[in-house]
Amino acid sequence: MNQEYDMMAHKPIFPLLMKMAIPPMISMLIQSKDNIIDSIFVAKLGEEALTALSLAFPLQNLSLAFSVGLGVAINALIAKSLGASDEKQANYISDHGIFLAILHSLLFVFIGIFLMKPFFLMFTTNPTVLDYAITYGSIVITFTFGSIIHITIEKMFQATGNMMIPMFLQGIGAIVNIILDPILIFGINGYLEFGVAGAAIATIIGQMTACLLAIILFRKTSRIKVSLKNFKPNAQIIKNIYSIAIPSGVMTSLPSILVALLNSLLATVSQTAIAFFGIYFKLQSFIYMPANGL
């Protein structure tokens, strides 16, 4: 029995809640940072670039919402199995978590390749804004698999009571993004100047870095073991996962749907209105995302 599990089994509820709630709250706060960090730097490229990121924000948050929904479900089922001292079942559920995370990643690859332009055409006909939005959105959605797999592994860590590693991983991803954003957006001495595309690339590299570290640390430190060799999906486990993941994902995605609807209304006013509303909502996300961590 490891230290985290022993703590979960025997420590008083309130101190345990405080010890376990703060790291995931910080982690969820950092999870909402990608588009916000990008927007800070992209704003220097002009209003049209900032508007493009505001249009991409709901779709980016939607992918995050369903990733978190899947992670919450995996977390709950693993914790239940560990509570029953059934480590073999916990491992099997973890296998399903990684398997479904890969399938979700393929779905977002399809969305990123084929649905970007139709989606953004609902909100703007400005060719510059449309080009920026498609460029940024296509990159961050098509290559979001790093974020999806990372979040799934993060929730597996949390299911065993380990709250610090997920927070550390989110912090590393954010730091990489912050460092690379100005370099890849504005370039250095005329090199690596990619503009809006650079913001998206920096985000993806940050996510991939966190994902790679998550895989390494999970393999080395977690009591849960994942192996897709000879893996056979179990319909009942998948049903149990989605019975939690779908409601959780839908609830978490509602703000993103609201933003998309409001963007469609603001588009009839001006592109500036979309840009300003995007800034407001990104700041607001710093309030409700930590609550999801609790």
What is the role of each PLM region?
Residues 50-110, 114, 147-166, 258, ...:
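Small-residue-rich hydrophobic transmembrane alpha-helices
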Residues 1-21, 78-145, 191-246:
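Short alpha-helical transmembrane segments in multi-pass integral membrane proteins
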